Amino acid sequence: MMDDTAMPARAEADAAEDELAAPAGIDRTAKADKDANRVSPMMAQYVEIKAANPGSLLFYRMGDFYELFFEDAEIASQALGIVLTKRGKHLGEDIPMCGVPLTRSEEYLHKLIALGHRVAVCDQLEDPAEAKKRGSKSVVKRDVIRLVTPGTITEDSLLDAKRENVLLAVARTRASGEGAYDYALAFTDVSTGSFRVVASDGDMLAADLARIDPAEILVSDAVYDDEELRDFWRGLSTPVTPLPKQSFDGPQAEKRLAAFFGVATADSFGSFARAELIAAAAVVAYIERTQLGARPALAPPQREADGGSMLIDAGTRVNLELIRTTSGERRGSLLAAIDRTVTAAGARLLARRLAEPLTDIAAIRARHDAVGFLVEETELREALRKRLAAAPDLARALSRISLGRGSPRDLGAIAAGLKEGLAISSAFGPETPRDIARCARLLAAVEPWLAEELTAALADELPLNRRDGGFVRQGYDLDLDSTRALRDESRRVVAALERRYVDETGIKSLKIRHNAVLGYFVEVTAQNADRLREAPFNATFVHRQTMAGAVRFTSVELGDLESRIASAGERALALEQTIFDRLAAAVIEASRPIREAAEALAELDVLTALARLAVDERYVRPEMTEGVDFAISGGRHPVVEQALARGGGPFVANDCDLSPPETAQDARIWLVTGPNMAGKSTFLRQNALIAVLAQAGAFVPARAARLGVVDRLFSRVGAADDLARGRSTFMVEMVETAAILNQATRRSLVILDEIGRGTSTFDGMSIAWASLEHLHEVNRCRALFATHFHELTALTQRCQRLANATVKVTEWQGDVVFLHEVIPGAADRSYGIQVAKLAGLPKMVIARAKAVLTELEAAERVSPAQRLLDELPLFAAAARPAPTLAAPTGPHPAEPVLEELDRLDPDALTPRAALDALYRLKAMLRDAADD
């Protein structure tokens, strides 16, 4: 016997087609004018539901499809690349329509959410057959069951397992002073339950948003439309959702928070500024709205300490490729290079720690203690990693259960995670570092009975959906066991009945099947159908449905059997649903210790991963100091080093010492010169990345490192046009430089690469000169300043804490060889022409460039511009011919000879072949001279 589980093919969709089109038998042309202004019942329902969900694309269930109409259809069609068609008319106009199959709806939802759209999922709340009982024109009951937005998704199929999915609200309140405002950010990951708030201001807002990296931003209409902020919001790549002013209602904020968490007052969470309360309340209000009243297991909001993490602006994060590369990919970033985590939660926590390195030296040292302990304890580290790899994603499973979207597999994940956590908690002795000991305590705090109860209740193989049943272990509930036995016995009776019908009718292909519309039925091929319609079988079998190639019948005996099976099956499923609800309630009751256990598992994963990284890549523990030290011995770029290792090449390690000289209290600045491709940018970036790694709690790629805590990290490395804001490359460069010079403090670290290159030589040199002096005299910070303006090296005579450094190169047979070694001193040349030659510029261009360079270098310092105009015909307004420098009008006659000579390999030629080649070359030269 086989079950036919397919749904009736778009039965409801066909009914809707009838609603939208003229009934059969009536002239459609004549009826069109009459019905031009009539709204069909189905479309009236659609319009009503759509009006209640503005700003969202409405997925409207029609049988086996979700369909979209009107403007939603046009948007979805373009976004998803699916066909836009039309279905009937509304108020005399064609209705645009597109649809996606129910079976692929999650895939299309993922695409729409990734593009920043919000989707309201409207489902059928009853079977179409129930609607027909109320009358032929009755519409199936429907309503929105999910509001899916970029910041509130919890389904694994829509989430990146290794990336947080943050919903963030920005609140603004008036501050003292004319036109002054206080800002606050509240942000939560609904899929894990984390919830934090932080104070901000207009200057810090962009940096805070870059650090948190939200999936969706909530702001009030007034703030979104503020003239000063309008371009800012619209320039963000993150979806921004404007909300009515009431969502940011200050007087109701505290009450809303207290009601959400079920406490008398929000004061129990700590002291919050007014803007912080408003932002937090806006977040929970939006969650309640999008989750249709369901409440995820959020942690109470925690206030971030001011200055608790290294400030890294958005541009610096992009330049350093901390979490993603400039093209938006994870691969090739610092995170990808150091990630040795074995759990999704650990990967998310590692990304967060890289995004917000600590500034509290005690907390940094505590993380280093934990990593160092695990570096030494090899067996313990590897045993922990093995257990952690078996731990599911507790936090996301808990969130789905608390929202009523949990599955049997989510309950299984809770059971498995808690069991692994309890086992891990007993693995540590009394001499465990502080951070690890805290994790062990949190894991041990979960009562063992919950994991035991879940394990006893759940089967080994769990279905994806609770509605499928079959997830309760045999023997757990006696009532369920007896009901299942009745159901399963009935199924064996159906199989026996099928065999009897085959024997009685002689139709070997006869099958008893089942679907949701007909229930159980007998199916035979069209060729055998007449046999059942004739005596004596027509007294037993009643025709029900004719299909293409098959005919379906039923019988009284089969109907009675179906009633018994349905009753037992429905009761068994109902019992399982009751057990599921009871287990889910127990999990929700223990949500706080479960959430804390999930955080502990993630932290242990990060610590063991960083220890494994240190062992594998030879990283060392940095010495953290209270001062402004920055002394790195044998530093390496973590990403470039691994890339070179994959190709079998070594990475050249370099020292960097920006610590204050003995006679000064402020840090050094290194002025780095050297040719392009020599490794200046790599050197600058690697030192910034070492600071980030150290303060994130990791060991660093170096032989030794002594570092004072960096409060702010600034980088201006590379630039591009900002066409959306009408900014040229040079303007972007100047804006970034201005931010650095205005904000860098004595404890900051600044890396600057080629300031002033986007304008004329003298303008650029002047700006670079003045910027370098400002860093030295005003900011007095640690800095690496790379430049091609060699004239700046003379500033070391006036600036006590400025030191010259250069990237070592050598020449071999006219070519430049990059040694990638940073040494004291200044470069005397940029080797730009040699680099151009390596890049493959035509030989004639290289030769011309050398000639021009010779003239430039020989130019007199007095009035050089006129000298160049006179002696370089290519640039002169009225050229005075100079035979050796005349601008070429075509290929040089000798160029074929040079190319032929370049192709020859003397070591591969026999004496006779070499002599022939020599004669051939002389002949080519003679022909060239004749031309």
From Swiss-Prot:
Residues 1-34 are annotated as: Disordered. Keywords: ATP-binding, DNA damage, DNA repair, DNA-binding, Nucleotide-binding. SUPFAM superfamilies: DNA repair protein MutS, domain I, DNA repair protein MutS, domain II, DNA repair protein MutS, domain III, P-loop containing nucleoside triphosphate hydrolases. One of its GO terms (biological process) is mismatch repair. GO terms for molecular function: ATP binding; ATP-dependent DNA damage sensor activity; damaged DNA binding; mismatched DNA binding. PROSITE patterns: DNA_MISMATCH_REPAIR_2. The keyword Nucleotide-binding applies. InterPro entries: DNA_mismatch_repair_MutS, DNA_mismatch_repair_MutS-lik_N, DNA_mismatch_repair_MutS/MSH, DNA_mismatch_repair_MutS_C, DNA_mismatch_repair_MutS_clamp, DNA_mismatch_repair_MutS_core, DNA_mismatch_repair_MutS_N, DNA_mismatch_repair_MutS_sf. Signal peptide: none annotated. Residues 1-10 have a biased composition (Low complexity). GO terms for cellular component: cytosol. ATP binds at residues 674-681. This protein is involved in the repair of mismatches in DNA. It is possible that it carries out the mismatch recognition step. This protein has a weak ATPase activity. Belongs to the DNA mismatch repair MutS family. NCBIfam families: mutS1, PRK05399.1. PANTHER family: DNA MISMATCH REPAIR PROTEIN MSH1, MITOCHONDRIAL (PTHR11361:SF34), DNA MISMATCH REPAIR PROTEIN MUTS FAMILY MEMBER (PTHR11361). This is DNA mismatch repair protein MutS. It comes from Azorhizobium caulinodans (strain ATCC 43989 / DSM 5975 / JCM 20966 / LMG 6465 / NBRC 14845 / NCIMB 13405 / ORS 571).
